[in-house]
Amino acid sequence: MMTAKAVDKIPVTLSGFVHQLSDNIYPVEDLAATSVTIFPNAELGGPFDQMNGVAGDGMINIDMTGEKRSLDLPYPSSFAPVSAPRNQTFTYMGKFSIDPQYPGASCYPEGIINIVSAGILQGVTSPASTTASSSVTSASPNPLATGPLGVCTMSQTQPDLDHLYSPPPPPPPYSGCAGDLYQDPSAFLSAATTSTSSSLAYPPPPSYPSPKPATDPGLFPMIPDYPGFFPSQCQRDLHGTAGPDRKPFPCPLDTLRVPPPLTPLSTIRNFTLGGPSAGVTGPGASGGSEGPRLPGSSSAAAAAAAAAAYNPHHLPLRPILRPRKYPNRPSKTPVHERPYPCPAEGCDRRFSRSDELTRHIRIHTGHKPFQCRICMRNFSRSDHLTTHIRTHTGEKPFACDYCGRKFARSDERKRHTKIHLRQKERKSSAPSASVPAPSTASCSGGVQPGGTLCSSNSSSLGGGPLAPCSSRTRTP
């Protein structure tokens, strides 16, 4: 093996590197003193005079002429020496390799350029038992192939040569999660060092194993479904293993209070028209129209459940917030005719009918079983609900007998009728002689400031109909 001097590392390719070298970069005088012998007992001479050219694919053809002196190559006894005339050309094949600077320990600490001599051939194949041939043989399966003219060719392909002159990929990060992806680089370094020291050949490029497929459960386990993250109890709630009717948030229904039923429209219609209204009355009722009615249910069990749920005796009795205006006023009905006293403490009311007592007890309990279907407002009495519904419908069934004005409530019509009656009394009490002459400027068919009527209305006092309400003023 012949080793050249250490030179500066030039980042060029093989062919470019050969063209840049001058002819006298390694003179014979310096090479004889520092190089080692290629073959045993061979004299170092000067046949290395010039380089004729570079063959393709990284092949270096060096024509060795015997201008200065002959080269005697004694071979071992097992091989016959080949005579080499002075005027015959020798062909050499060599390989240049520039070792990059590895970040760690390198198997080439000196960083030199190695020239591996494959052999000297002259028409026949050189001995394969030499150290250089054996080292190249151990490095590649088919190291050399000799052509008809004695030119040695390399068996390695161009990608292998490109890998030798290109820096290797950076080492992968060795972390806990990447331990399965890449192997320890010390195994490659130790193998390369052993191969170099034993066979003096370049180690094969380290081949990193490809990453494991993503389907490997050791690397990235595929989650089959989300229930793997949840405990068994949550899985049952998510997937509904208890059945399709399972509620996500179950809660006891006995703790909730059932809202009061709506008053049927038939009850409201019957009450408005003055007909009998059927309904479920409270305890002790004698068939009155008070009490809630079941919406759309006629079974006895539902009626009993509703009656028990809305039983006034089950609710606490509270004192009346607004006391009576005349609490000590004697009733017109004798006491023995009012057998239903109020059970609330501090209330001395007595009633002659049980439905009246039931309606009164709702004042203490706050029970309002009648609900408006339009605004969902609750009422304690059905007549209050009926009157309230008329505010939504605009119905005014009560008309005034004197002026024809309509009202939604009978008490409103009664209050309005009193106005006409007071006016009639004033007309009858005023003497006809004391009526002064009316003034057309101030009289508009109404009542004058003195309280007398206009002359236009005096003719109608004798039993005729009263004037419209718009032409009269309200008097206290």
Swiss-Prot record:
It is found in: Nucleus. Keywords: Acetylation, Activator, Charcot-Marie-Tooth disease, Dejerine-Sottas syndrome, Disease variant, DNA-binding, Metal-binding, Neurodegeneration, Neuropathy, Nucleus, Repeat, Transcription, Transcription regulation, Transferase, Ubl conjugation, Ubl conjugation pathway, Zinc, Zinc-finger. A motif (HCFC1-binding-motif (HBM)) lies at residues 162-165. GO terms for molecular function: chromatin binding; DNA-binding transcription activator activity, RNA polymerase II-specific; DNA-binding transcription factor activity; DNA-binding transcription factor activity, RNA polymerase II-specific; RNA polymerase II cis-regulatory region sequence-specific DNA binding; RNA polymerase II-specific DNA-binding transcription factor binding; sequence-specific DNA binding; sequence-specific double-stranded DNA binding. Changing residue 359 to W: In DSS and CMT1D; loss of DNA binding and loss of transactivation activity; loss of small and large myelinated nerve fibers; residual fibers with thin myelin sheaths. Residues 281-290 have a biased composition (Gly residues). Its EC number is 2.3.2.-. Residues 415-425 have a biased composition (Basic residues). PROSITE patterns: ZINC_FINGER_C2H2_1 (PS00028), ZINC_FINGER_C2H2_2 (PS50157). Pathway: Protein modification; protein sumoylation. The modification N6-acetyllysine is found at residue 247. Its main location: nucleus. A zinc finger (C2H2-type) spans 340-364, 370-392, 398-420. Residues 127-141, 429-476 have a biased composition (Low complexity). Sequence-specific DNA-binding transcription factor. Plays a role in hindbrain segmentation by regulating the expression of a subset of homeobox containing genes and in Schwann cell myelination by regulating the expression of genes involved in the formation and maintenance of myelin. Binds to two EGR2-consensus sites EGR2A (5'-CTGTAGGAG-3') and EGR2B (5'-ATGTAGGTG-3') in the HOXB3 enhancer and promotes HOXB3 transcriptional activation. Binds to specific DNA sites located in the promoter region of HOXA4, HOXB2 and ERBB2. E3 SUMO-protein ligase helping SUMO1 conjugation to its coregulators NAB1 and NAB2, whose sumoylation down-regulates EGR2 transcriptional activity. This is E3 SUMO-protein ligase EGR2.
